[in-house]
Amino acid sequence: LSQRGVGKGDTVALIAPNIPEALECALAIPMLGAVLNANNVRLDAATLGFILEHGEATVLLVDTEFSALAREAVSHSGRDPLIVDIEDPEGPGGERIGELTYEGLLAEGAPDFPYTPPADEWDALALNYTSGTTGRPKGVVYSHRGAWTNAVNNVVTWEMPHHPVYLWTLPLFHCNGWCFPWTITMLAGTHVFLRSPSAEGIYGAFAQHAVTHLCGAPII
């Protein structure tokens, strides 16, 4: 992204389920100084279009399962972001609508990218939106300090050891996965992904990966 001029303060939007690429975005986009905007895949196109416009997205990364939704959302937004298609081999597939694929974008990257920590810990790291049940969605900004504090708090509250095995049943787009992308990575843990949580998938992950931690809404 830096090779394409994306930098500090630019909003990079994401429409994707729980997949490894979403985690990579949660780590890489803030390292760029840009702002991660992970979006709820269950929202309608008009609402997503409002978010893309209001959040001033310059880049949109989209899992091809949601390509039709993303195309319509962009048409509602009045913006012309760089669209990057994520093709998950375990997903149902879908049409490419972007200028390039996610893997193609990675191939453009500079292996010697010079990471520079934020000059101000209050710089924006992520931009989330409320569900908009009483009107238009409202933007909520996470700072680097806020995300770090929440990530550390997860460790303290759960008394988490090093090397946990975390099952992603909570959407990464929900409050940035409650900051567990950074918590688990900080602890040198293992991330186990489920595109769509189900009883079979959850219990199967328990058996296959010896899961130690997970989060979820009451329905999970």
Annotated model-derived regions:
Residues P17, V62-R71, L170, P197-S198, ...:
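Adenylate-forming
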Residues W148-V165, F173-H213, I219:
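Conserved AMP-binding/adenylation subdomain of ANL enzymes
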Residues V12-L14:
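Gly/Thr-rich phosphate-binding loop signature of adenosyl cofactor/nucleotide-binding cores
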Residues G98-E99, E108-Y129, R136, E159-V165:
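Conserved pre-ATP/AMP-binding loop-to-beta segment of ANL
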Residues Q3-R4, E24-L27, M31-G104:
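Structural core segment of the AMP-binding/adenylate-forming
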Residues L125-T149:
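Conserved AMP-binding A3 loop
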